[in-house]
């Protein structure tokens, strides 16, 4: 048995790509997209027609609507391949606007429903800012399920649990990147690998807390830099993995054991916490890594959204 098949025994495997022609080979349950992945995909000849067809069909419509229609086109293609859910992201430029995020999410769902897609097959991705979490709480009450992304800290995870969101996406690789860069020449890779990886440790802390207190929100580890980070999180609810790393797992025959165990977490001595807005903002500010990576992640998604805008305008 290869490691990908072994991982599927413990964890729901999700494909992290907009390149849906790569997905089928790995038979994931779900798939995730984001503005950067869609931008990367539409620049490939195989997918250019999705962009030009969308613009041709809806020429004259507002640019933000064209963007949403393009995202839904990709999502529908992906859903024709996978049995589960696709995650589609609200424009990151709305990350600090609760009202606008809710409105865009509702439009995305309406567009999916117009294509015959049931609401339960879509997760709306929203950045895990205070405003994004508030938007997700409203959406969940309306029966629209959410995936809180750009999650780097324990306080974000707790606030998401309080909001009863469907799923969170803690970013393993970007946490690793920050600590590696911060350490500079003092970084020793083997001392920070596997279970000692700071990104892995962050997800483990969240996993243990959620399972200890019976929190229903799903945890989907994301943003992996190497296979070791993935195998160290075997047993996490879901892991979203790039095609490149899916291929490496598929090619590896080494044994793979469960690393995270919900039953074991229930016996841990942990204290329940909660955050109001002031407490959340203070805790996030105290975490330099999370503060910097959240801001950086939003900026990067905004840059790619603007590039997608330009491609739509030029089509």
From Swiss-Prot:
InterPro entries membership: Aldolase_TIM, TAL/FSA, Transaldolase_1, Transaldolase_AS
Single GO biological process annotation from the record: pentose-phosphate shunt
EC class of the enzyme, as a word: transferase
One GO cellular component, as annotated: cytoplasm
Pathway it works in: Carbohydrate degradation; pentose phosphate pathway; D-glyceraldehyde 3-phosphate and beta-D-fructose 6-phosphate from D-ribose 5-phosphate and D-xylulose 5-phosphate (non-oxidative stage): step 2/3
Family to which the UniProt record says this protein belongs: Belongs to the transaldolase family. Type 1 subfamily.
Entry-linked NCBIfam families: talAB
Name by which UniProt lists this protein: Transaldolase
Annotated organism of origin: Albidiferax ferrireducens (strain ATCC BAA-621 / DSM 15236 / T118) (Rhodoferax ferrireducens)
